[in-house]
Amino acid sequence: MAAAGLAQIPDVDIDSDGVFKYVLIRVHAAPPSEAPGGESKDIVRGYKWAEYHADIYDKVSGELQKKGHDCECLGGGRISHQSQDRKIHVYGYSMGYGRAQHSVSTEKIRAKYPDYEVTWADDGY
């Protein structure tokens, strides 16, 4: 049941164009009381409306907690999404949460956008 709940959460939800902040979030399934927790998945969320990385984390974690999931922010960065050129570049870091593991974020983005050129770098802010 818990795994089914996690499966319904999209791995990636990012805006379609522009440069914006993103966070990598680990979502934990709400375990049954007699079973140990342990099932989790990492998700990528990035939006232009967010002034701070915490704005994204607070909104997403609040929505998921209402469904019984625990969340932790693994870090953040920026995404440059050029849909016309079919390119996404992941880079930078979050002042509050630190640098996300961009290689993990990039793999998840590649799975959602298989016909895009998806790259990452640790440099930049």
Curated annotation (Swiss-Prot):
GO terms for cellular component: cytosol. The keyword Isomerase does not apply. The keyword Nuclease does not apply. Belongs to the janus family. It holds the Pfam family Ocnus. Its main location: cytoplasm. Monomer. It is found in: Cytoplasm. It comes from Oryctolagus cuniculus (Rabbit). This is 14 kDa phosphohistidine phosphatase. The active site is at H53. The modification N-acetylalanine is found at A2. It catalyses: N(pros)-phospho-L-histidyl-[protein] + H2O = L-histidyl-[protein] + phosphate; N(tele)-phospho-L-histidyl-[protein] + H2O = L-histidyl-[protein] + phosphate. One of its GO terms (molecular function) is protein histidine phosphatase activity. Its EC number is 3.9.1.3. The gene is PHPT1. It is an enzyme of class 3 (hydrolase). Keywords: Acetylation, Cytoplasm, Hydrolase, Protein phosphatase. Exhibits phosphohistidine phosphatase activity. May have a significant involvement in neuronal signaling.
